[in-house]
Amino acid sequence: MKQRSLLSILCFILLASGVASVSAQTCIENRKYFTPNGTYDSNRRLILSSLPNNTASRDGFYYGSIGEEQDRVYALGMCIPKSTPSDCSNCIKGAAGWLIQDCVNQTDAYYWALDPTLCLVRYSNISFSGSAAFWEIEPQYLVLNTATIASNLTEFKTIWEDLTSRTITAASAARSTPSSSDNHYRVDFANLTKFQNIYALMQCTPDISSDECNNCLQRGVLEYQSCCGNNTGGYVMRPICFFRWQLFTFSKAFHNITLATTPPLSPPPLQRPVVASQPPSADNRDKKRDNSSGKISMKTILAIVVVGIVILIIISGILARRFARKEKPYQEVELNQTGITSVRSLQYKFKTIETATNNFSERLGHGGSGHVFKGRLPDGKEIAVKRLSEKTEQSKKEFKNEVVLVAKLQHRNLVRLLGFSVKGEEKIIVYEYLPNRSLDYILFDPTKQGELDWKKRYKIIGGTARGILYLHQDSQPTIIHRDLKAGNILLDAHMNPKVADFGTARIFGMDQSVAITANAAGTPGYMAPEYMELGEFSMKSDVYSYGVLVLEIICGKRNTSFSSPVQNFVTYVWRLWKSGTPLNLVDATIAENYKSEEVIRCIHIALLCVQEEPTDRPDFSIIMSMLTSNSLILPVPKPPPSFIPGRPNQSTTRPSSQNINDGRWSLLKMMFH
């Protein structure tokens, strides 16, 4: 049975190699280059991370920018019309990820993602909105099927040329506003035989003129004909236009379209074209190709190499699994009981951890779920070991939750999980060791808080936002932290923040905006009002917690130290803001060693985060833009919740917060450019 399965896989690979590979990203080489991990790179990553949400929520098209002067990055996202928000967001997210991965230092790049839907992502260091200078960038990735039309070629070309001609005319006509993906878009098909259609899709960016769109598409069709006119499908891509045709539907683009009437042809009804596995010989267009039966083409060589590599990988995987089965897994029953067998490769033997921590002798701190100890593995790596003290079912769930979630997360502002261990009721989580411990350990200690000057605090504010932005927009799946606080921000040797403690975190579906729980988990003072009162949590409840955290970082005091019968922490800050004295909040240990405009801007952002209504709060992509672009004008904040004893329950008066990501921030998002 296993041999048959392996044979099926290999056969599939060999068959698939008969189709040319799709590589639709273009890192433009004739422009400037940036320094990886520099300011331009950070701005590039930031604006690309915000594209999925901005594009999906804006009629399938978004253009904006972030940064200043030479570090300014312009970006565009576009989906085909009638894409679902989920399909559009996923497509843009995938395309942006490929650009970040493959275009390591190019300041200009674009990517057409082809399936399961079609979308475009482009970024540049110069503004390109409405620019049709496509001829300076040669068409990239003329991708085609290696099969060809072997009979009825004349009749086929007549139908094909008519289809592409009318599709160009329809696509280039302006039908809606320049900010809608429905502008300059058309799909159509034509009957080839009774049982076979030809399908075509054409799209231009909606911000160019009809003539520019027409010229770009016409040029693409002519280039395809001169290159690959006998093939059974293909595409031509430029930064501003896209053309594809196939003998099958694609990109979820052909639902509910009306077939335009095909002009009558003088020849008799067509027979179904014969698709040959090899290109036809003796055609002037194909003279550049090497059709000699005595020579092996480069495409064939590449296919053989790829197949060989894949076979080696499969064989290596099979051998590795066989060897792994020979070693009996330890604590198999207990591991299965935790429900985390999918990450079993991260499991340490309990004895290893016991030895590494010298029998748990050097305690670093204590949290709500247990003690944290310092250790050293046999290879010399320093580790932090969380030893869960509670034995309840809830603690088991949080243990499983944290291990499974954190094991999949990779970001410089998220703590890195190294492994775990289970022995009976003992449950251990192993993290990277961070020498400066947690933020609260330094921030709220009068003898240590002087180590955090304003520059370090500002770095912690920005780094924490980047970490949560990753959880909300860039991780798969979306994660709501639910317990963001100073004690859950760890600091490395350079005071870079790393978000930690995912025991109470929850996963959100792609289209999910809010969830309700009967057991609100979190820390009083950081919890949003809708979460405390109604059990509603969302991305915006994390935003609220972040706002409180930012204010704590500025003042150097716990939020609980400001509570009184008439006000709480956020209302105290609000009164300072309204009285025009926000700098009275600043920690005295910072003295005058700070930029007042930066501090005031951070207080302003924090007050936007702690507004009472979830829909009034910015999402983290906007927060990052506020922190990195001083030219962005901030909205006037609304009053925060007071939580004063005796206050009427808000649940009877608060409007529904089901639509967490409504349009209140759309104007601000449009200001990126």
UniProtKB/Swiss-Prot annotation:
Residues 358-633 form the Protein kinase domain. Its EC number is 2.7.11.-. Residues 264-292 are annotated as: Disordered. Disulfide bonds: none annotated. InterPro entries: GNK2, GNK2_sf, Kinase-like_dom_sf, Prot_kinase_dom, Protein_kinase_ATP_BS, Ser-Thr/Tyr_kinase_cat_dom, Ser/Thr_kinase_AS. Residues 25-299 are extracellular. The modification Phosphothreonine is found at T523. PANTHER family: CYSTEINE-RICH RECEPTOR-LIKE PROTEIN KINASE 13-RELATED (PTHR27002:SF997), RECEPTOR-LIKE SERINE/THREONINE-PROTEIN KINASE SD1-8 (PTHR27002). Belongs to the protein kinase superfamily. Ser/Thr protein kinase family. CRK subfamily. This is Cysteine-rich receptor-like protein kinase 13. The gene is CRK13.
